[in-house]
Amino acid sequence: MESESHWLWLFNTESGKLSVKLSDTDVFDTPYKPSQLVNIHFNEQMMDIEDATTFQIVSETLEAYPADKMPCAPQNAALNATAWCRFGRPQMPQSWHFQKSDISEWPLERRLCELNSGFDQGLFLILDTDDEFATCLLLSEGMQLSAIKSLRQYHVIKVTLNRLLPATVDLALSAQSNWGQQLA
């Protein structure tokens, strides 16, 4: 992914596309519809320091995992996460799509989770949490929520904390680390 020193947010009112201009030749389109976004009344806007910080944190978080364990490129996920954090419309929780977990408290340092709809299970990046809710971005290629509803990759959903499941990739890496320590 090529980049210049200043990335720009682009919003095309005709196509309804929010994009990031990374260089003169490289533009990254986000999957979000105008109805999912707020504060998009511009054609071109520079990314600010908060955007850069969000991008950096998400990139570093996802790059810490083996590439073969991640269903998407860390930079693509980071760009979409940054776009959502900046322009995403606040959501009402949609916890009813997902099965409850047995976890009473979610560790703040845990940034990946899984959600299970009973139809499908997906890997998510936790964008933010409060005492009750988590806003999660789907990293998996897609996820079936019900017989008639699905989520596409990089779409965001808000759920209660009691729906979050530990990410299988975290459990596998933890087990691998424990085995390595026992063998040493």
From Swiss-Prot:
Record GO biological process: division septum assembly; FtsZ-dependent cytokinesis
Subcellular location: Cytoplasm
Protein name: Cell division protein ZapC
Keywords: Cell cycle, Cell division, Cytoplasm, Septation
Function comment: Contributes to the efficiency of the cell division process by stabilizing the polymeric form of the cell division protein FtsZ. Acts by promoting interactions between FtsZ protofilaments and suppressing the GTPase activity of FtsZ.
Organism for this UniProt entry: Idiomarina loihiensis (strain ATCC BAA-735 / DSM 15497 / L2-TR)
Name of encoding gene: zapC
Summary of subunit composition and partner proteins: Interacts directly with FtsZ.
GO cellular component, one term: cytoplasm
InterPro entries: ZapC, ZapC_C, ZapC_N
Pfam families noted in UniProt: ZapC_C, ZapC_N
Main location: cytoplasm
Family: Belongs to the ZapC family.
